[in-house]
């Protein structure tokens, strides 16, 4: 009798255990997949030249760039919310020359979009973009007078429009008829010079300061952006990003251009080669040129800015 009761107890216990395991399994399988996707990417890019008894001559040099990219993206049937933080900083050192900055960026992007039709690839969107830099910038070899600083300048874009997302988000196109652009120049010395398009200081005939330069310039205009990310061939990824802006109130039709084209060539999980170019044109950024050592000015106006990159990088993603 005792043995029968013991066997019945074991049988009931096993049934309860299996039922509990089955319930837990079903609960896990019914948990909704997270609609958030995250990306954390750290990249270190290096270039180096070294010469020993090289008959053609040359300077030893080493360059390094650190890049951090963080993304937090949300998407459901009707709503998309994309957030991105980008930062990069680069330095270069050559023999018999001071340490020089080669790259400096802090950028924050956020886009919120809504569609009322699941079949549509166009979203009514609000887009925010902010850019500035970490440290002082100089027109080398002159390091006595900075030409830019942290928050001098800083750019802020905020607009409403419509954005297209391809099926796999490889291609994004944003069109905004109304975007507010704010240019901050918080350093008063740069603001007094009228740097980056803000109103300069006003002086009387004796050179006495009458009114300080403005620290803020506000514009309203048209904003267009596109980004295309694709794998052009095996282990070669391309990112082509273009931003265009034109102010309604001041010289409408003069377009500010920000165009980045980058290729990542994957060698293995943690090593890549990087080839890239960055073109900037801003009608408010005036470049100075001198004729001679006396500092005689011959030109003051906007110019196309170009930066190129070729290097080997170490990548860590988590």
Give a label for each model feature.
Residues 52-58, 93-99, 143-149, 206-214, ...:
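Extracellular loop and loop/strand-boundary signature of outer-membrane beta-barrel proteins
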Residues 32-48, 79-81:
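Transmembrane beta-strand segments of Gram-negative outer membrane beta-barrel proteins
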Residues 304-318:
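Outer-membrane beta-barrel "beta-signal"
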Residues 52-56, 95-99, 137-143, 185-192, ...:
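Outer-membrane beta-barrel translocator domains and adjoining extracellular loop/strand segments
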Residues 40, 44-46, 66-74, 108-114, ...:
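Residues on the lipid-exposed face of transmembrane beta-strands in outer-membrane beta-barrel proteins
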Residues 44-50, 76-78, 87-93, 128-136, ...:
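Transmembrane beta-strands of outer-membrane beta-barrel pores
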Residues 78-81, 119-124, 169-173, 235-238, ...:
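Repeated loop/turn-to-beta-strand initiation elements of outer-membrane beta-barrel proteins
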Residues 155, 159-246:
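Detector for outer-membrane/organellar transmembrane beta-barrel domains
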């Amino acid at each position: 009798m005792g043995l029968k009761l013991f066997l019945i107890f074991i049988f009931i216990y096993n049934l309860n255990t299996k039922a509990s395991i089955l319930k837990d399994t079903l609960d896990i399988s019914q948990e909704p997949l997270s609609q958030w996707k995250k990306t954390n990417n750290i990249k270190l890019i290096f270039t180096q030249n070294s010469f020993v008894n090289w008959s053609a001559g040359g300077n030893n040099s080493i360059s390094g760039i650190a890049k951090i990219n963080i993304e937090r993206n949300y998407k459901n049937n009707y709503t998309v919310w994309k957030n991105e933080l980008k930062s990069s900083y680069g330095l270069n050192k050559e023999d018999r020359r001071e340490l020089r900055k080669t790259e400096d960026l802090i950028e924050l992007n956020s886009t919120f979009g809504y569609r009322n039709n699941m079949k549509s690839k166009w979203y009514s969107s609000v887009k925010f973009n902010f850019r500035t830099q970490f440290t002082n910038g100089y027109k080398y070899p002159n390091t006595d007078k900075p030409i830019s600083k942290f928050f001098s300048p800083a750019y802020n874009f905020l607009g409403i429009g419509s954005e297209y997302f391809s099926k796999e988000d490889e291609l994004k196109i944003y069109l905004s008829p109304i975007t507010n652009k704010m240019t901050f120049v918080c350093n008063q010395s740069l603001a007094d010079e009228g740097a980056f398009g803000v109103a300069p200081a006003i002086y009387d005939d004796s050179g006495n300061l009458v009114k300080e330069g403005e620290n803020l310039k506000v514009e309203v205009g048209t904003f267009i952006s596109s980004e295309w990310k694709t794998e052009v061939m095996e282990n070669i990824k391309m990112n082509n990003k273009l931003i265009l802006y034109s102010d309604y109130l001041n010289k409408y039709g003069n377009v500010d251009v920000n165009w980045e084209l980058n290729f990542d060539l994957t060698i293995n999980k943690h090593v890549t080669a990087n080839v890239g170019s960055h073109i900037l044109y801003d009608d408010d950024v005036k470049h100075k040129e001198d004729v001679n050592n006396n500092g005689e000015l011959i030109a003051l106006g906007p110019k196309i800015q170009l930066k190129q990159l070729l290097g080997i990088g170490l990548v860590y993603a988590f």
